[in-house]
């Protein structure tokens, strides 16, 4: 079996009490099934920790220390966090009525040092969320303005689609890569744009979902297989213990569904996870420009582990790179940086995209 020639979905249940699973992620087929089994079997028994506040914090710290893939890249002094957080956990009275809240808040605080939207602590009463990866970035989206452009849109396969600028430009808004679509859906969408000069593909506020859907959509914009990046997984407990890079390809799909005319992809800081991988891949598609803000990142595929008390921590365990070998964890910059003004009266990213397509059309031989 040749590397990178097809994709295998890994959707395994939790393997052990400290097992793991990959969520909504697709990997290229590896050189042999033994490599896949080796990856799945890389989980080993951690130091046995007591089911106490301090024991759970120690277990959480060790899981991140040994399995999280961005400790070195983000220059995090993870070692320095262990003792202070365990000491604070030891001060929690396990018999206190709010002990579970105290422990949760302490763990969430520790995890937020990672600044990673793929890192979550799941409990029966709350889920931790990191927001630092998108806070403080300029706005590229206004929901009220956006609705005006969708007034006459049709909807199928998770995509709103319509035409703009006197029916001369196609427009698609895809709000989540969790929404499935078929080749037939794409056929009807693209057929409705047959007389259009170009296409605006809007993935702002798209927080991700299936990497398979992301690459299937990207395949619409190429007529040949295209290398778009690489991935690596942890293979040891050291912060830099990774497998060799494996290539990621976007493969040509149904040849009926090809769009090779000018295309503008709109992105913002909330374009995260699978959407981040999508815009990274689209940089290698002909006739495509990225417009908007730096995407949100989330260039690590997630894995989950269970703590002694039954809570689950999810974190990034597989690193993804672009075709030049650069990490996409911190986001993908657009070709043209743009944002909404403080008091917008129109969606100027959409209007800017229309201008770019019209300019390209006016300066072409048609």
Which residues are covered by each model-predicted region?
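Short linear motifs in intrinsically disordered/low-complexity regions
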Residues: 8, 12-13, 127, 167-168, ...
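Bacterial Sec-dependent N-terminal signal peptides
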Residues: 1-50, 365-366
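Flexible, low-complexity junctional segments that flank or bridge functional domains
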Residues: 41-233, 240-247, 262, 304, ...
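C-terminal "post-core" interaction segments
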Residues: 43-64, 207-366
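Short regulatory "switch" loops immediately downstream of catalytic or recognition motifs
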Residues: 1-7, 88-93, 320
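Polar/charged alpha-helical tracts
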Residues: 17-23, 80-83, 147-151, 339, ...
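Intrinsically disordered, low-complexity segments enriched in small/polar residues
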Residues: 2, 17, 29, 36-39, ...
